[in-house]
């Protein structure tokens, strides 16, 4: 006997699988193929939205907007690439609500191919015009990488942070703190060279920002912006 799905169930399945289908298309798309994405806020407007939210958060005046669950189509103002550290929750530190941020997190706020495809999906399919790479004080991944550098036997995650350590070796200040900022800067610069993202950066449709989060104050400091 054939399996029949109610129209509501079928619609939910189609909605849930759409992002997966897009990522598969993106992975095998010919070079130069572009995708039409809905228009969202400009890079400057999106960045200001998040900086205003962080100012509310640090002033203990968070409004917690749009905190209820939603099944509406998503139109995030920004992609956040941040560390998995539990003390760095993007929606809270930016005082944003459900649907406001497209968040990709891993230890050390670097990325691999799978994370990159998620970022490309947000920019190419959802129309997101801003990417913020967030490093933070006391990052355990960077601390571990500094301790392991330059051992070739370190994990791939730690090796991803090695370029930041190499770039800051011998500079004044704390080696770990220096590497934390440099790691965010280099990750943002690497994203800006991605074949799917670089044309949008060049045209001004996309801005990629490196930032650092202060665990004690809750404040975000912009390091660089492409």
Language model region names:
Residues 133:
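Conserved functional hotspot residues or short segments at active or partner-binding sites
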Residues 30-74, 98-99, 108-126, 143-226:
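Divalent-metal-activated hydrolytic enzyme cores
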Residues 16-29:
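Bacterial N-terminal signal peptides
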Residues 1-11:
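N-terminal secretory signal peptides that target proteins for export/translocation
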Residues 89-94, 115:
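Short, glycine/acidic-enriched capping/hinge loops at junctions between secondary-structure elements
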């Amino acid at each position: 006997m054939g399996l029949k799905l109610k129209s509501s169930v079928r619609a939910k399945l189609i909605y849930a699988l759409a992002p997966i289908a897009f990522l598969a298309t993106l992975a095998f798309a010919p070079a130069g193929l572009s995708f039409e994405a809905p228009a969202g806020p400009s890079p400057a407007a999106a960045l200001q939205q998040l900086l205003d939210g962080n100012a509310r958060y640090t002033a203990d005046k968070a409004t917690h907007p749009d905190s209820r669950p939603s099944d509406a189509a998503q139109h995030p103002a920004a992609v956040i690439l941040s560390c998995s550290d539990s003390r760095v929750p993007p929606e809270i530190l930016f005082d944003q609500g459900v649907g406001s941020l497209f968040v990709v997190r891993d230890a050390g706020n670097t990325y691999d191919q799978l994370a990159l495809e998620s970022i490309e999906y947000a920019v190419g399919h959802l129309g997101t015009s801003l990417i913020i790479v967030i490093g933070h004080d006391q990052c355990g991944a960077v601390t571990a990488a500094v301790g392991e550098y330059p051992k070739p036997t370190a994990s791939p995650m730690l090796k991803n942070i090695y370029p930041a350590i190499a770039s800051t070796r011998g500079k004044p200040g704390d080696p770990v703190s220096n590497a934390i900022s440099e790691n965010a800067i280099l990750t943002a610069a690497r994203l800006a060279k991605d074949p799917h993202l670089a044309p949008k950066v060049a045209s001004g449709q996309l801005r990629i920002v490196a930032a650092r989060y202060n665990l004690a104050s809750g404040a975000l400091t912009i390091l660089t912006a492409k």
